[in-house]
From Swiss-Prot:
Its main location: cytoplasm. Residues 36-85 are annotated as: Disordered. The modification Phosphothreonine is found at residue 320. The gene is SOL1. This is 6-phosphogluconolactonase-like protein 1. The modification Phosphoserine is found at residues 65, 68. GO terms for cellular component: cytoplasm; cytosol; nucleus. May be involved in regulation of tRNA subcellular distribution. Residues 39-57 have a biased composition (Polar residues). Keywords: Cytoplasm, Nucleus, Phosphoprotein. Residues 75-85 have a biased composition (Basic and acidic residues). The keyword Transferase does not apply. Belongs to the glucosamine/galactosamine-6-phosphate isomerase family. 6-phosphogluconolactonase subfamily. It comes from Saccharomyces cerevisiae (strain ATCC 204508 / S288c).
Length: 321
């Protein structure tokens, strides 16, 4: 693995992280809604991160199957109608992980008046297979801390795509079902071999796992066919989960890590100074090189040797990124 240095924005305190992340999210939203999407299918879709030449054909079989079923139900439209509909229905597609990231978004986004919630399609980077009422549920936490608090009459209602709660006792079936949801959400776009999120938001745990991709689960980290995988016997927290895979994360237009707290400092040091260790986030830093940003407070950057940048807020929307 070569050394790839992402952008690292440093902050003195949690409040600064929350405000900057919110600004970053809004900029990504505005870029997506104003500019549309730039396809990277030729960059990522035909070539596996791990060299599996069969990935493209097998993935396309799954995608085409779902698209065929959807088309048979929905009839057909001429090209001009499709183009007009696409422009009118342009959406901001975002993936969220759970944990402390939800609190960061709660603090930063809910006080903003420029969030176009009604144009958001929200997916989850991973999910713990527990009831939504559980404090361990990523969707449940996001619902209580964010979704239930949105003034939908003023800002609109986001479309939220979560797992089927009735499938939490079967990790494989739950993962397969959520993958079908992703395929339906992205298969009509230019890039269909892999979904391309406008923004993929992640945290990073003290043990180095991101989403539900754990450092010592090498088979999961090498997965390059499935979009969503089951994760069983997780070493911390709920043992059964599902997770989006490394290729899906790396295919996003922007990938952003949000990390705070002194307990994260050792793992951040390893990620930034020893990428050859192959932690999941180091793989993402490499696989999505040039599109990765880290928002980290000073506590998590203690004794970390890395170039730190000061985040500049977008006073005026500049869509040159």
């Amino acid at each position: 693995m070569t050394t790839t240095v992402p952008k690292v924005f440093a902050f003195h305190e949690f409040a600064g992280v929350a405000e900057a992340v919110a600004d970053h999210v809004i900029h990504a939203q505005n870029s997506a809604l104003k500019k549309g999407k730039v396809s990277r299918s030729t960059q990522m879709s035909g070539t596996s991160l791990n060299g599996n030449g069969n990935t493209e054909s097998k993935t396309m079989e799954r995608v085409n199957s779902v698209r065929s079923n959807a088309s048979s139900r929905g009839g057909s439209e001429d090209g001009a109608t499709k183009k007009l509909k696409k422009e009118k229905e342009r959406r901001f597609k975002i993936a969220l992980s759970g944990g402390s990231l939800i609190q960061v978004l709660h603090e930063g986004l809910l006080k903003r008046d420029d969030v176009q919630w009604g144009k958001w399609d929200i997916y989850f980077a991973d999910e713990r297979l527990v009831p939504f009422s559980s404090s361990e549920s990523n969707y449940g936490l996001a619902k209580r801390k964010i979704f239930d608090l949105i003034d939908t009459e003023k800002y609109g209602t986001p479309k939220i795509y979560h797992i089927d709660e009735s499938l939490i006792n079967d990790p494989q079936e739950c993962a397969d079902n959520y993958e079908k949801i992703l395929i339906k959400g992205f298969a009509g776009r230019d890039s269909v071999k892999l979904p391309m999120f406008d923004l993929f938001l992640l945290g990073c745990a003290p043990d180095g796992h991101i989403a539900s991709l754990f450092p010592n689960f090498q088979e999961n980290l090498r997965e390059n066919l499935a979009w969503v995988i089951p994760v069983e016997n997780a070493p911390s927290g709920p043992s059964n989960r599902i997770s989006l895979t490394i290729p899906v994360i790396c295919h996003s237009h922007r990938v952003t890590f949000v990390v705070e707290g002194a307990t994260k400092a050792p793992v951040i040091k390893t990620i930034m100074e020893r990428p050859e260790k192959g932690l999941p986030s180091s793989i993402v830093n490499e696989g999505a090189a040039g599109r990765v940003s880290w928002f980290v407070d000073d506590d998590a950057l203690k004794d970390v040797f890395v170039i730190k940048k000061k985040y500049k807020f977008y006073d005026d929307e500049n869509l040159t990124e």
